[in-house]
Amino acid sequence: MSDGSERSEQLARYVAALRNSPHNLLSPKGLAELESRHIPESLQFAASLPGPGRVLDVGSGGGLPGFVVALARPDLEVHLVEATGKKAAFLDEVADSLGVRVVVHHARAEELAASDLAGTFDVVTARAVAPLDRLAPWCAPFLTSSGTIHAIK
């Protein structure tokens, strides 16, 4: 981001898009905690990441934390994986309207694992996607040899 005010404006527009979406991108509780919990946690996660690098958010849903990481950290190349068409379309539309540089993959992680994305990410994250014993095999194929998985509950 070029400056803090631009980031704040983009975050506000992103939050408004989440709140106004007809697609139930977040649960009622998630919407209630969006600005008090989910956005701050995503920003904190973004700040903790080394850079430059590549980040993959598996099961992006409404874009937490991946979309917020892309907003906060333009030095990172962020990819979002979302299997549900309406959610992937939302992420594409919001990225275009806000000018945020992300790549949205409308697919299941298991399907993409055999693609040219395998072994190319420094960080793979997933928030409330599945238990760790199921999640790790979905995420591991995307990691570089020194990459890490960040599973967020």
How does the language model describe each region?
Residues G62-D75:
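Conserved SAM-binding loop of SAM-dependent methyltransferases across substrates and taxa
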Residues R73-H79, A83-K153:
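S-adenosylmethionine
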Residues L43, F67, D133:
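Conserved active-site region of classical short-chain dehydrogenase/reductase
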Residues R13-L18, G63-L64, A107, R134-P137:
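Short hydrophobic/aromatic-rich motifs at helix boundaries and adjacent loops
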Residues G59:
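Conserved glycine-centered beta->alpha loop in an early N-terminal alpha/beta scaffold
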Residues M1-L56, A72, K86-R101:
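Class I SAM-dependent transferase core
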Residues N20-H23, V69, L117, F142:
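A generic structural signal for ordered alpha-helices
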